[in-house]
A protein has these predicted regions:
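N-terminal, polar/charged subdomain of small-to-medium soluble alpha/beta proteins
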Residues: 1-86
Length: 86
């Protein structure tokens, strides 16, 4: 899977499962290429979500919801994820 496919899947799954105004996904893998733990095919992403639904939850609850939605992608394709809720 390439990063563009992953971004589309992440956006689609978030939008299908959470009421959101916007979902933005940024590839931050380039910042970690020189790290010893870097693996080809594993990506670092930054996820920015504008959602009243998530904003009303605390940080742990909103993160758990996102982790559950992206469970398969986290196991196979995402090495790290930064989540920003607005």
């Amino acid at each position: 899977m390439d990063i563009n496919q992953l971004i589309e899947i992440v956006k689609r799954k978030i939008n299908q499962n959470i009421s959101c105004d916007t979902v933005e996904v940024e590839d931050k893998t380039f910042l970690h290429r020189s790290h010893p733990s870097h693996q080809n095919g594993k990506f670092h992403i930054k996820l920015k979500i504008k959602s009243l639904y998530l904003k009303e939850k605390n940080k742990i609850e909103s993160s758990k919801k996102i982790y559950k939605i992206l469970d398969e992608e986290l196991k196979k394709y995402i090495h790290s994820i930064q989540i920003l809720i607005d």
